[in-house]
């Protein structure tokens, strides 16, 4: 290093030679120190070359940069995958909303209420029960003022029982007023048909024997008179007038009395009429 003593001290950072470049470090007042290895004195300036030592910090920086690059790439991949998943979920939700059935009614749960299918079905059932209870309250008089399902049901039960008792009482009263219909088990329609048949039998019974009596009777002509009424309770009367003969047929509270006076032919006629009445009631 004795050959470089003639160089000025102002050059701190390096020296340019014909065949190489020499780095040196030092201050203005101190001796110059170099980081290059020692150069033998025999070596000439023309053939001398300085090999710089690379610091280990550069080697350490490379793997760190590679690690950070790999981490950044991994994070970017994860972010992309998460974005794809979120996009797929949003797309699937949109499809489900579009493909929802038309009859389905979306019920938005209130605060403190669940949204699962079981709770929704239970809520619908309770709403139906409340509607039926309102209808029953409207049917029962004075039941609108009652609160509580148990009390409402008690009022409804009592009202139905009272209606049942009234129906039974009315049916018993009707049966007591018309014992003929309920005693014999005859309906009102059947009873009206039966009365019409009886009237027809009366007309036939009166018309046929009257012609017979007119042929075999005395010169004094006999005639038949029949009084009928559907509304009044007056009895049916059959009178045959002629000479000293007199027959009468009367009805009093369902009992028929036959009074006969005269010849055997007239008695036979009266028996025929009575038999017809008896057959009609059997």
Curated annotation (Swiss-Prot):
One of the record's GO molecular function terms: protein dimerization activity
Subunit structure as annotated in this protein's UniProt entry: Homodimer. Component of a nuclear cell elongation controlling complex made of ILI5/BUL1, LO9-177 and BC1. Interacts with ILI5/BUL1 only in the presence of LO9-177. Interacts with IBH1. Binds to LO9-177 in the nucleus. Interacts with BCL1.
Name of the gene encoding the protein in the UniProt record: BC1
Similarity comment: Belongs to the bHLH protein family.
Cysteine pairings via disulfide bonds: none
The keyword 4Fe-4S belongs to this UniProt entry's keyword annotation: no
Designated name of the protein: Transcription factor BC1
SMART domains from the UniProt entry: HLH
InterPro entries named in the record: bHLH_dom, bHLH_ZIP_TF, HLH_DNA-bd_sf
Keyword DNA-binding: no
One Pfam family from the record: HLH
Phenotypic consequence of gene deletion: Reduced plant height and grain size. Erected leaves, with reduced lamina joint adaxial and abaxial sclerenchyma cell length.
PANTHER family per the UniProt record, alphabetical: STEROL REGULATORY ELEMENT-BINDING PROTEIN (PTHR12565), TRANSCRIPTION FACTOR BHLH137 (PTHR12565:SF431)
Annotated keywords: Activator, Nucleus, Transcription, Transcription regulation
Polar residues bias locations: 45-55
Subcellular location: Nucleus
Basic motif: annotated segments: 113-126
Induction context: Triggered by the transcription factor RLI1 to regulate leaf inclination in response to phosphate (Pi) availability. Repressed by phosphate (Pi) deficiency in lamina joint cells in a RLI1-dependent manner. By brassinolide (BL).
Species of the source: Oryza sativa subsp. japonica (Rice)
GO cellular component, one term: nucleus
Residue ranges constituting the bHLH domain according to the UniProt record: 113-163
Chain spans, region Disordered: 34-123, 219-251
Residue numbers covered by motif Nuclear localization signal: 109-116
GO biological process terms held by the UniProt record: cellular response to phosphate starvation; negative regulation of unidimensional cell growth; positive regulation of DNA-templated transcription; regulation of leaf development
Region of interest called Helix-loop-helix motif, as start-end residue ranges on this chain: 127-163
CDD domains, sorted: bHLH_AtBPE_like
General function of this protein: Transcription activator that contributes, together with LO9-177 and ILI5/BUL1, to the promotion of leaf inclination and grain size by modulating cell elongation. Involved in the RLI1-dependent modulation of leaf inclination by promoting lamina joint cell elongation, especially in response to phosphate (Pi) availability.
